[in-house]
A protein has these predicted regions:
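Metal-assisted phosphate- and nucleotidyl-transfer catalytic regions
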Residues: 43-155, 178-191, 195-196
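Hydrophobic face of alpha-helices
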Residues: 41-48, 169, 208
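Active-site pocket scaffolds in enzymes
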Residues: 163-164, 169-222
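Active-site lining segments that contact anionic ligands and/or coordinate catalytic metals
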Residues: 3, 24-26, 119-122, 147-149, ...
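A residue-level signal for conserved active-site and pocket-lining positions in enzyme catalytic cores
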Residues: 29, 84, 125, 162, ...
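Hydrophobic/aromatic-lined pockets within catalytic cores
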Residues: 1, 11-15, 48-56, 89-92, ...
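A generic structural motif
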Residues: 28-39, 156-158
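Class II aminoacyl-tRNA synthetase-like tRNA-binding/catalytic domains
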Residues: 1-34, 191
């Protein structure tokens, strides 16, 4: 089972930066009956390959006018979150200040590193810390400090967040309890898991960020 959606997203977060909008367009993909979160990454890779091919074939004139050189999505490397932090800290002599998230500068340096070392325009950063991800993100059974999730960086900017979700009802309740959250108001959501839910996952692509990086703009509002 697969669900695809293009729709507006409204976010109550700080947006006085070059990369944030409080209203943006999201391309959402959700997949059921998966064996691994890597299937979701493979699906996004295929989507990007299709999208770049379509742009090249149908919009060559517009790309020439805008002086856009399409990125290479034929192969997208992946690196664990903790490994990525260590790589850029060592390579660029940078101190790790936040062990639970990537700072914008770190994202840019990861993109730079993989461009220099592998000539890659995109890179998946996987296994984000559980503290950073929503309660429904599935923890890595081999190390529950991390999750079976990922971000996709395009030229050093996060354009996608995705991963595998918890599908077991009791595991979901435990995660909610461990987070100190209340289930009040979530009954309808939780009931769908009580009666059975297949292993599933998905992702969201920020369309404005993707477009910004394709055009080489410095500000998402442009």
């Amino acid at each position: 089972d697969r669900v695809f959606e293009t729709g507006p997203v409204f976010r109550a977060e700080k947006h006085n930066t070059k990369r944030h909008l409080n209203e943006y367009t999201s391309l959402d993909f959700e997949m059921g009956y998966i064996d691994s979160f890597e299937e979701i990454m493979a699906m996004e890779t295929g989507f990007l390959q299709y999208a770049m091919k379509l742009l090249k074939e149908d919009y060559a004139k517009e790309l020439e006018i805008l002086k856009v050189e399409l990125p290479d999505a034929s192969r997208i490397p992946a690196v664990r979150f903790d490994v990525a932090k260590e790589l850029v800290a060592k390579k660029y002599n940078r101190q790790i200040r936040n062990p639970f998230d990537l700072e914008p500068e770190e994202e840019a340096l990861i993109g730079q590193y993989f461009k220099e070392e592998y000539n890659a325009d995109f890179v998946f950063v996987t296994h984000y810390p559980s503290k950073k991800r929503p309660f429904y993100a599935m923890d890595d059974p081999e190390d529950t400090r991390f999750t079976l999730s990922f971000d996709l960086l395009f030229h050093g900017l996060e354009i996608t967040t995705g991963g595998q979700r918890i599908h077991d009802y009791n595991a979901l309740l435990k995660k909610i309890e461990d987070r100190g959250m209340e289930t009040e108001g979530m009954e309808q959501y939780l009931d769908t898991f009580k009666y059975g839910m297949p292993p599933h996952g998905g992702l969201g692509i920020g369309l404005e960020r993707l477009t910004m990086q394709l055009l080489g703009e410095e500000n998402v509002r442009e």
